[in-house]
């Protein structure tokens, strides 16, 4: 019975670790997305500045370009919020891993104590 409890604790620990890795992967993807968004906005801003300086873009077009850049910035803020929410998910997953690890240690110690008791009996 204690051996089964240890196996269940091992399985729960492995599942918690898998869930943590998944949440960390999602976080990395969200952070990469933000990085791409920032780079895209900077690239477009430079492109618009170059076009305005060279005369390819009219001054009247500049206001719509600025509005577009502002919308891009707003999307970056939304992405930062998603990243923070994902960081919280990672923290929760880390707590679950710690809890599962503690349960595994407890189950292993109980099994070893029982085995030692059997040896001495």
Language model: regions and residue ranges:
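Charge-rich amphipathic alpha-helical interaction elements
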Residues: 1-121
């Amino acid at each position: 019975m204690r051996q089964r409890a240890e196996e269940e604790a091992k399985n729960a620990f492995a599942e918690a670790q898998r869930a943590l890795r998944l949440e960390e992967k999602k976080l990395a993807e969200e952070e990469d997305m933000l990085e791409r968004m920032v780079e895209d906005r900077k690239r477009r801003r430079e492109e618009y500045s170059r076009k305005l300086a060279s005369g390819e873009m009219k001054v009247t077009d500049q206001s719509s370009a600025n509005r577009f850049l502002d919308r891009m910035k707003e999307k970056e803020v939304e992405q930062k919020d998603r990243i923070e929410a994902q960081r919280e998910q990672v923290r929760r997953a880390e707590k679950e891993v710690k809890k599962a690890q503690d349960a595994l240690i407890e189950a292993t110690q109980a099994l070893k104590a029982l085995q030692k008791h059997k040896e001495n009996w």
